[in-house]
Curated annotation (Swiss-Prot):
Protein name per the record: Putative dihydroorotate dehydrogenase A (fumarate)
Family classification: Belongs to the dihydroorotate dehydrogenase family. Type 1 subfamily.
Catalytic residues identified in the record: 132 (nucleophile)
A molecular function (GO) term: dihydroorotate dehydrogenase (fumarate) activity
Native source organism of the sequence: Pediococcus pentosaceus (strain ATCC 25745 / CCUG 21536 / LMG 10740 / 183-1w)
Cofactor requirement: FMN
One GO CC term, this protein: cytoplasm
Upper classification of the organism: Bacteria, Bacillati, Bacillota, Bacilli, Lactobacillales
Alphabetized InterPro entries for the sequence: Aldolase_TIM, DHO_dehydrogenase, DHOD_1B, Dihydroorotate_DH_1, Dihydroorotate_DH_1_2, Dihydroorotate_DH_cat, Dihydroorotate_DH_CS, Dihydroorotate_DH_I
NCBIfam families (alphabetical): PRK07259.1, pyrD_sub1_fam
Compartments reported by the entry: Cytoplasm
Length: 304
């Protein structure tokens, strides 16, 4: 077996490295810079029932230690994705597992998008972005309430019984463990953690926030220690597969998340400054494994 191969929720991956949702859209641009077949899987941007225009510009801002973004889930909607984006990936990368990231404004939206996303043959995982605001609860993110997380997970698994469903956890909670356990009770096949942290920057010239939305999700190196801590906490209480994300800029960063408890990793903000980031991290894994005396990536898997 190749030293980089591993298995997550029963799906074989040629490497443990994926892109993070929203950092490579549906793959066409990233494919100009790296061979997508190097990836363990490709994660599409979060897709909703209807097309979304997203927030007006500016939607991103570089900040100390990372990026702030408030794109507003801009996407063409599930029907377009099923008709055009996923077929393009299937035609050009037939052996590449696709992670279908989904989002919504209410639980019914999530369930319907998950059901439709799962019909695509090349979608091997469903990733549920539960950092979205719950309109019925005054805008509070779905992922902050264990009761909501458990119920939503159960409802999604009811319509997607034959493909792994991974819940992507928000770090914007007092305690992450109850949220992870709620997802497990609901039948989640795995977890993706962590999503971005809410932040803000103010332009001193204008006295206004730098992002049109005011606040935005903080990603990048600044959140890496938080991801390590939360993954470690959750690994202590569950054997669910974990895909780690948060400030992965190097092979050593990836290994740190895996030592904490992840079986695979996603690369997000690093792609903004370096379009070859995923390739570079994959190429650096074997030398880093040799340096720190790891035999293979599969030893990090919770599926022994």
């Amino acid at each position: 077996m190749d030293r980089l191969e591993t298995t997550i929720a029963g799906v074989k991956l040629k490497s443990p490295v994926m892109n993070a949702s929203g950092t490579a859209a549906y793959g066409q641009q990233m494919a100009k810079n790296i061979d997508l077949n190097e990836l363990g899987a490709f994660v599409i941007k979060s897709t909703t029932m209807e097309p979304r225009a997203g927030h007006p510009w500016p939607t991103t801002a570089a900040t100390t230690g990372g990026w702030l973004n408030a794109v507003g889930l801009k996407n063409p909607g599930i029907e377009h994705v099923l008709a055009y984006e996923l077929p393009w990936l299937a035609e050009n990368y037939p052996d590449l597992p696709i992670v279908g990231s989904i989002a919504g404004s209410n639980p019914d939206d999530y369930v319907e998008v998950a059901k439709r996303m799962a019909t695509a043959p090349n979608v091997k995982f469903i990733e549920v972005n539960i950092s979205c605001p719950n309109v019925a609860k005054g805008g509070l993110a779905f992922g902050t309430d264990p009761v909501v997380v458990e119920d939503m997970t159960r409802r999604i698994k009811a319509v997607v019984p034959n493909k792994p469903v991974f819940m992507k956890l928000t770090p914007g909670v007092t305690e992450i463990v109850p949220i992870a356990l709620a997802a497990e009770r609901g039948g989640a096949d795995g977890l993706v953690m962590i999503n971005t942290l809410m932040g803000m920057e103010i332009d001193l010239e204008t006295r206004k926030p730098r992002l049109s939305n005011g606040t935005g999700g903080l990603s990048g190196k600044a959140i890496h220690p938080i991801a390590v801590r939360m993954i470690h906490q959750v690994r202590e209480v569950t054997n669910l597969p974990i895909i780690g994300v948060g400030g992965v800029f190097s092979a050593k960063d990836a290994l740190e998340l895996m030592v904490a408890g992840a079986g695979a990793v996603q690369v997000g903000s690093a792609n903004y400054g370096n379009p070859h980031a995923c390739h570079d991290i994959i190429q650096g894994l074997v030398p880093a494994m040799d340096q720190y005396h790891f035999n293979n990536i599969a030893e990090f898997s919770s599926e022994k």
